[in-house]
Each structure stands twice: as C-alpha cells, then as structure tokens.
C-alpha cells in the first residue's frame, strides 16, 4: 500500500484477529482507521484499546463502504460453507484494496465478486503461512523457509 497518509482503512469485524490487523494498518502509516462489527459492544471494546479508531455502525456499512481505500474482512463471514455479507460491495472505490483474513476457502463470495470487478484482492493465506512460520520458530527455534512450492502446496490443499 503506497501513499498511506491520506488513505482510509476499514476493519470489518472486532474479534480475535482484529487487534493485530489494526496494529498492522497503523504501522503501514494509515492514520484514518475505522472498525465495524455486527455487535457494537466489541467495537467499543476495541476503541478502548485503540483510541484512534472510528466506529462505523453495522447498519451504516452499506452506505459508508464507498469511503474507504483499504477494507479488511476480519470476520468469520465467508468461511467454508458459511454465510457471507448480506450486501454487495458494488459501491467500493475502483482502486480499493480488499484483504480477506479467511484462507479456507481461498476465495469467499465477496473476494470473488471484487476480483471479477477488477479490484485488488488478497486472501488470508499469507497471514496463515507467516503465522505458522512464527509459531514454528517460537516452539523450535528454527525458522522454516517459505517458498513457492509450499505456497502452491497449500493452495492445492485448500481448493
């Protein structure tokens, strides 16, 4: 993500992965970070941890989604055989970057839609791989190499 100073990011979801996602966004230089969740209390909890967050009510998501440059799905929506968002993302900016923390399936319905519309999309596979690498190192003090062969193997197994 380039020229982050004036970018606006939205984290959809306020569960377990959200704090790490928020910190990563902040480290990238994006200053304007919002969060939304089906349960508003979880957003309020995150706002207490990260006072710089703006809370977007879930009911306003459909109309607000067009205001963001980076959108991260940190919910369970789209998981294998699971529900997906009950609205589409047609009003997102053409240059939006959509990141889905889900890696199984590799492409959720929302991911597929945005990809077909020509938006930049990334799934959660890299996060999964590098999280595994870090965990392996913490347990074994060995840093396993991540190469194209490993990525292809995981891609084939998750399809």
Enumerate the predicted regions with their spans.
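Short, well-ordered alpha-helices that flank and scaffold nucleotide-derived cofactor binding pockets
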Residues: 23-27, 45-48, 112, 116
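NAD(P)-binding Rossmann-fold cofactor-contacting core
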Residues: 28-50
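Glycine-rich adenosine-cofactor-binding loop
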Residues: 5-26, 30
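Hydrophobic Val/Ile/Leu positions in short beta-strands of Rossmann-like dinucleotide-binding domains
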Residues: 11-12, 35, 100
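Rossmann-fold NAD(P)-binding glycine/threonine-rich loop
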Residues: 96-153
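Glycine-rich helix-loop-beta junction characteristic of Rossmann-like nucleotide cofactor-binding loops
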Residues: 1-4, 90-92
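Rossmann-like adenosine-cofactor binding region
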Residues: 53-121
């Amino acid at each position: 993500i380039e020229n982050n100073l004036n970018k606006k990011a939205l984290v959809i979801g306020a569960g377990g992965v959200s704090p790490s996602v928020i910190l990563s966004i902040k480290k990238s230089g994006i200053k304007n970070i919002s969060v939304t969740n089906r349960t508003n209390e979880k957003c309020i909890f995150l706002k207490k941890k990260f006072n710089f967050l703006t809370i977007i009510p879930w009911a306003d998501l459909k109309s607000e989604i067009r205001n963001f440059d980076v959108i991260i799905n940190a919910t369970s929506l789209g998981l294998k055989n699971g529900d997906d968002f009950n609205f589409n993302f047609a009003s997102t900016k053409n240059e939006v970057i959509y990141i889905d923390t889900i890696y199984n399936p590799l492409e959720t319905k929302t991911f597929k839609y945005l990809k077909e519309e020509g938006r930049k999309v990334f799934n959660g596979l890299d996060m999964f791989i590098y999280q595994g690498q870090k965990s392996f190192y913490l347990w074994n003090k060995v840093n396993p190499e991540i190469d194209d062969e490993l990525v292809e193997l995981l891609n084939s197994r998750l399809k």
